[in-house]
Design a protein with these regions (language model features):
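Conserved phosphate-binding elements of NTP-dependent enzyme cores
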Residues: 1-942
Length: 942
């Protein structure tokens, strides 16, 4: 039978150079190559884009207007292509309502399970509550031993204050003779005088019966009479001290608390029928925090301790806020020059929360010298800022205030997102929120062993089977430490991608082309086998799985490897080698093959640095950290390792980075929970080199971020042409009026709105996409205008500015981190996370350092080929050579083996992690029998 292929001919998207390639269908194919070589251009911008476009074209024009139309990629022909699904890292849902449970759809099945077989309990007292029909009540009472005496009461008042005169009169007129009030029997004919301010319980005696055959009709009539009197509640007194309370609705027969009819929507925090009415299902509230408003309590009020807009000028004697603080100090007898931390607790409370109903006398002279005396109630800093926030309509001003807010759990639901009634329903003795907070491995065990009655099992069988299958897929991709309640916005790119991968396997689609972008990111070597097995399973279902990947194990297990290169940018865009791992290893032109065969390798450092000073963290308890004490060496290169979810990010990002940024950089951050930190005096600043974009708009680019554009504009402004025309540096900015093209406001492109098609961006007709007006472009330096320079690659700019050391140094560092191929004016929106991170790294390397900086990097090898990793390690070593402290969270063993010191966390993820397993040099950790990292590291050190 003829093998089916996806045939690509003449692919020219981005830097691809007329690529012709045949990819076998229903296979696991890895696309690899240097960063910027064209892998993503081939996988996402060509194969996926064309597969998606063809599917879209099959839809009606009406449907297309809602879905959007994808542009046809620059390719001559693609044959044998299936509908394509892209699972990348950029499409993580940041909606606060989105959780792991909702993304995987497990929560939808859980809602159905709880609605169908959940046992409701009273939200107040916790008693199990059941609703029963009149017939069920009769049958229950008739099962009592013959001769059993009983009294039927209607509880008409339960624990309410008042004299209840009208109610008692109404009951008497209805023909009832006796009632039990607060436990005592009364004849309704007698005068009953109840204490108005006490709580009372009134139960009307409806009937007295003895259990025997033939009383069913009378019992039924009496029960119906009771239920009509008491809104569905029946109290049976058996005259021996035993009482039975029954209800026709989900209401507690003891205290009367009721819950609504149980439906799947009762457990949805995105539906008003289930959502907590206080936080509307978000689970938290944003509240102003005094710690963020007064970040440095060692300052006095006169020194500007308050950093809130409108209060920052409180040290200015002409401001009204200063006049109020003076009035406060006079009334309560404290000095505005005393450090805030030394003020008495009572005074600090008044400053933050106000004087209550007490007035103060404020003497205020306006800028025109007119003096006024006011009697005002001081509302307090927190109340003042909250009021101004609520009254303000400007989005920019709101964002300004929001930096002083922190997230706190909702006071009503405590983060559970649901109404009390919904949270009182249990399955297997757990509420839906309790089951969702279990780590997925524990959740899977719980749902697999939950005890149900025979009837409940019949109802829930299909639901539980679906939940078990989907949670098992999550375990198969190494996400055992996550919980279903985890907010989707807090997931890393790799975690989000593996969740979507598990969801796709759960969907059971066949005949699809899956395009994945480095699914192994953030995954420990221990869990890599599970991920590879998952990819193979997706393939075995009958799908084509095309993975952009740099992981060695994935390459060795792939059916086919396509090596794109040979270099990056203009030097890439070609297929260097195609074949199995063994075939690639024999190819002399393939850098990937040379690394796989061991001909090329990232060398171990000749000598590991030693240290004398440490940054000491005590009592770290953020997330799953278990009261951790750890010493982080200073002036060396340290890697924090451990399985996914072991607590690395909680320690490094939430505690070390945020506390150091707050103290050293005066940043408005609230660190995670820890007891104390020592050793900060050896550092002067902390810099987090993450993978967030270098800018949010196309106006931001590598030239503006690195600061080289300022130097280039200075150079153009000092040219002969510019001086003759009187042009200054500002003339060469595309962000301000003067030199830019005003037709496109310096964007170079113009947006044209289309109705049934996506918006089209076309080059500006006035400047032809060059961003500047004609006069500005006439100014040249060495024959090139400002647009030509922005269009240069880093490599070209290095040659062009050979005699300008300040510019050349910045270009050199960009080349050192493997970014020789990017253009100086390339919009930040076109850069990958890995490229953005390396631009930040290069910017730091080009600065003249103090040698006292703490650099923090979280998985910097994302998107990097073996050769790029080698360059990255060299850069990190250079930072440490300058006396700086480099702290890296990493799973890549080539980086780990080059570190001076390792902090290995674990042993497992989630609740099974959160401790420091071992510390030491890579050699010491490799010999530790309890370290998973050490086990895999061993072969890299030999």
């Amino acid at each position: 039978m003829e093998k089916k292929w996806i045939k690509i001919r003449g692919a020219n998207e981005h830097n691809l150079k007329h690529v012709d390639l045949d990819i076998p269908r229903d296979s696991l194919v890895v696309l690899t190559g240097l960063s910027g070589s064209g892998k993503s251009s081939l996988a996402f911008d060509t194969i996926y884009a064309e597969g998606q476009r063809r599917y879209m074209e099959s839809l009606s024009s009406y449907a297309r207007q809602f879905l959007g139309q994808m542009e046809k990629p620059d390719v001559e022909l693609i044959e044998g292509l299936s509908p394509a699904i892209s699972i990348d890292q950029k499409s993580t849902n940041r909606n606060p309502r989105s959780t792991v449970g909702t993304v995987t759809e497990i929560y939808d099945y859980l809602r159905l399970l709880y609605a169908r077989v959940g046992i409701p309990h009273c939200p107040e007292c916790g008693r199990e509550i059941k609703k029963q029909t009149v017939d069920e009540m009769v049958d229950l009472l008739m099962k009592r031993e013959e001769g059993t005496k009983m009294q039927l009461f209607a509880p008409v008042v339960r624990g309410k204050k008042g004299k209840h005169e009208k109610l008692l009169e109404s009951i008497r007129r209805s023909g009832f003779v006796r009632a039990r009030i607060d436990g005592n029997m009364y004849e309704l004919e007698e005068e009953i005088d109840l204490e108005k301010n006490n709580r009372h319980t009134i139960e009307v005696l409806v009937d007295r019966l003895v259990v025997r055959k033939g009383i069913e009709k009378r019992l039924t009539d009496s029960i119906e009479q009771v239920l009509s009197l008491s809104n569905g509640l029946l109290l049976v007194d058996f005259l021996n001290g035993e009482e039975l309370r029954l209800s026709t609705s989900f209401s507690c027969p003891v205290d009367g608390s009721s819950i609504e009819e149980i439906e799947p929507r009762s457990f949805s925090f995105n539906n008003p029928f289930g959502a907590c009415p206080t936080c509307f299902g978000i689970g938290y509230k944003m509240e102003f925090d005094a710690e963020l408003m007064i970040p440095d309590e060692s300052l006095s009020l006169n020194q500007g301790a308050i950093s809130v807009m409108g209060w920052m000028n409180s040290k200015d004697e002409g401001s009204f806020t200063h006049a109020m603080l003076v009035a406060l100090s006079e009334k309560y007898g404290f000095s505005l020059d005393t450090p805030f931390c030394e003020l008495p607790e009572k005074i600090r409370k008044i400053i933050l929360q106000g004087t209550g109903t007490e007035s103060i006398t404020v003497r205020y002279a306006s800028q025109f010298g007119k003096g006024n005396v006011h009697r005002v109630v001081f509302e307090g800093l927190l109340n003042n800022v909250e009021r101004r926030y609520k009254e303000c309509f400007s989005e920019k001003m709101k964002q300004e205030y929001e930096q002083f807010m922190r997230i706190t759990p909702c006071p009503s639901c405590h983060g559970a997102r649901l109404k009390p009634g919904s949270l009182s329903v249990t399955v297997g003795e757990k509420s839906i929120y309790e089951s969702c907070t279990l780590p997925l491995d524990q959740f899977h065990d719980w749902i697999s062993t939950v005890t149900l009655t025979a009837m409940e099992e019949k109802i829930a069988d299909q639901i539980i089977r679906e939940i078990k299958a989907r949670s098992k897929f999550m375990l198969d991709v190494g996400l055992n430490y996550l919980s279903l309640a985890r907010s989707a916005g807090t997931l890393s790119g790799g975690e989000a991608q593996r969740i979507r991968l598990a969801t796709q396997i759960g969907s059971g689609l066949v005949g699809v082309a899956y395009i994945l972008d480095e699914p192994s990111i953030g995954l420990h070597q221990r869990d890599n086998d599970k991920l590879i097995a998952t990819l193979k399973r997706l393939r075995d279902l009958g799908n084509s799985v095309i993975v952009v990947e740099h992981d060695e194990d994935t390459m060795r297990e792939a059916d086919l490897i396509v090596d794109i290169g040979p270099g990056a940018g203009e030097h890439g865009g070609q297929v260097v080698a195609v074949g199995t791992a063994k075939e690639i290893m024999k190819n002399k032109d393939s850098i990937t093959g040379q690394y796989l065969s061991g001909k090329k390798k990232i060398p171990l450092p000749k000598q590991r640095r030693t240290f004398t000073k440490t940054l000491d963290v005590y009592g770290a308890q953020e997330n799953n950290l278990k009261n951790v004490d750890v010493k982080i060496p200073l002036s060396v290169f340290t890697c924090v390792t451990g399985v996914s979810g072991s607590g690395k990010s909680s320690l490094v990002n939430e505690i070390v980075h945020k506390h150091c940024a707050k103290v050293l950089n005066k940043a408005k951050m609230i660190p995670g929970k820890f007891r104390k930190m020592e050793g900060l005096e050896a550092l002067d600043k902390v810099i987090d080199i993450d993978q967030s974009p270098i800018g949010r708009t196309p106006r931001s680019n590598p030239a503006t971020y690195t600061g080289v554009f300022d130097l280039i504009r200075d150079l153009f402004a000092s040219s002969k042409d510019a001086k003759e025309r009187g042009y200054t540096k500002g003339r060469f900015s595309f962000n301000v009026k003067g030199g830019r093209c005003e037709a496109c406001s310096g964007d170079g492109i113009v947006k044209i709105e289309m109705h049934f098609l996506p918006d089209v961006y076309v080059p500006c007709e006035v400047c032809n996409g060059k961003r500047y007006n004609r006069e500005t472009l006439e100014v040249r330096y060495k024959g090139k205008n400002i647009y030509d320079v922005l269009n240069m690659t880093v490599e070209e700019a290095y040659e062009f500015f050979a005699h300008i050391p300040s510019i050349q140094r910045k270009m050199q560092t960009l080349m050192d981190v493997g970014l020789s191929y990017i253009r100086l004016g390339q919009p930040s929106t076109e850069l990958s996370g890995g490229e953005a991170q390396r631009i930040k790294l290069a910017t730091e390397l080009s600065r003249r350092g103090t040698g006292r900086t703490l650099y923090i990097l979280d998985e910097p090898t994302t998107g990097l080929h073996f050769e790029d990793v080698r360059k990255l390690v060299e850069m990190l070593q250079r930072l440490a050579d300058g006396g700086n402290t480099v702290l890296v969270i990493e799973h890549n063993l080539d980086v780990i083996k080059c570190a001076d010191y390792l902090i290995d966390m674990g042993p497992e993820g989630g609740s099974g992690g959160g401790t420091v397993l071992c510390t030491g040099t890579p050699e010491e950790v490799a010999e530790n029998p309890i370290s998973y990292t050490g086990k895999y590291l061993k072969r890299y050190l030999n």
